[in-house]
Each structure stands twice: as C-alpha cells, then as structure tokens.
Amino acid sequence: MDPHEMVVKNPYAHISIPRAHLRSDLGQQLEEVPSSSSSSETQPLPAGTCIPEPVGLLQTTEAPGPKGIKGIKGTAPEHGQQTWQSPCNPYSSGQRPSGLTYAGLPPVGRGDDIAHHCCCCPCCSCCHCPRFCRCHSCCVIS
C-alpha cells in the first residue's frame, strides 16, 4: 500500500475535538436531560417553542396578500419568481417571461421524482435544471 493512499482515506484520524469545546450550551443541555425524570417531557418543549414562530411568520406573510390590492398582490409573486430565477441562471431571468416557471405545486408528468429546483445538474446551457424538471419550456422539450 502506498502511504499517501492511507492519508487520503482517513485525513481526520489524528484530530480529536471534545464535544464540550464545540458548543458550551450543549454540555449544559446534556446534563439537564439525565437529571429530569422523563426525556419525553424535555424534548417537546424545544419543538413546541420552535413551531409557533414559523407558523406566525407564515400567517403574517400570507395575511397581507388576500387583504391587499389586486395590483400589489399580483406583483409580489412575480417578484419572488424572478428572485428564484436569478440564482440559477442570471442570464435567463430577463429573456423568459415569469409565466414559464411554476409556483406552488410542481406539474405532474415525467421526471417528477427529480428535485425541481436543483441548479447543479444541468440538462441544457440555458437554465441549468435537471432533465425533464418542467421548470422552464426548454426542460420540457429536452
């Protein structure tokens, strides 16, 4: 065996990091859990604390849309779609109308098991989406 191969296979074998040094609050949480009588009472508390925040944010985000003016309501989703297009391919956001992308549920058809918004598996040079992802017209025909 080549000694360089062994180094490449396990480059972190010589590194040892104690858990207490990673997060000081983690050590405190681990000490509290065994001292409590049941761990099931301790675990739902963080989940219950975390769940209301996103629900409140979603309700706050969704509430102005239906109550707002139709012109404002129509422009907000289009702006969100344009923001989504620019990270995938900044060159195509101005060339294609926003109607070619879908919002909400993905379309039903071939390739639905593929991640729809993946930008790292190009199927063509214009949109950089997976094959048959149906995000853009060029993906549908390829």
UniProtKB/Swiss-Prot annotation:
What processes in GO biological process is this protein linked to?
A: biological process involved in interaction with symbiont; establishment of skin barrier
One of the record's GO cellular component terms:
cornified envelope
Low complexity bias: start-end ranges: 64-74
Q: Where is this region: Disordered?
A: 28-95
Q: Between which residues do disulfide bridges form?
A: none
Molecular function (GO) terms for this protein are: identical protein binding
Instruction: List locations, semicolon-separated.
Output: Cornified envelope
**What family does this chain come from, according to its entry?**
Belongs to the CYSRT1 family.
Task: Spell out the subunit comment.
Answer: Interacts with components of the late cornfied envelope (LCE).
Cited function: Component of the stratum corneum that may contribute to epidermal antimicrobial host defenses.
> What name does UniProt use for this protein?
Cysteine-rich tail protein 1
Give the originating organism: Mus musculus (Mouse)
Q: Which gene encodes it?
A: Cysrt1
